[in-house]
Curated annotation (Swiss-Prot):
GO terms for molecular function: 4 iron, 4 sulfur cluster binding; electron transfer activity; metal ion binding. This is Ferredoxin. GO terms for cellular component: cytoplasm. It comes from Clostridium butyricum. Ferredoxins are iron-sulfur proteins that transfer electrons in a wide variety of metabolic reactions. Keywords: 4Fe-4S, Electron transport, Iron, Iron-sulfur, Metal-binding, Repeat, Transport.
């Protein structure tokens, strides 16, 4: 699964690209639900700061 690191700027680009809606707005940044994530990598491909990383 992918996780979003602290470089997240909460732009929301990743959430719009997730085909399974695994990405939601958290308190300070976006969060990926590891149980829902299908490891497609769309979030990492569109993130302007490279915050999503595969675990």
């Amino acid at each position: 699964a992918f996780v979003i690191n602290d470089s997240c700027v909460s732009c929301g680009a990743c959430a719009g690209e997730c085909p399974v809606s695994a990405i939601t707005q958290g308190d300070t940044q976006f969060v990926i639900d590891a149980d829902t994530c299908i490891d497609c990598g769309n979030c990492a491909n569109v993130c302007p700061v490279g915050a999503p990383n595969q675990e």
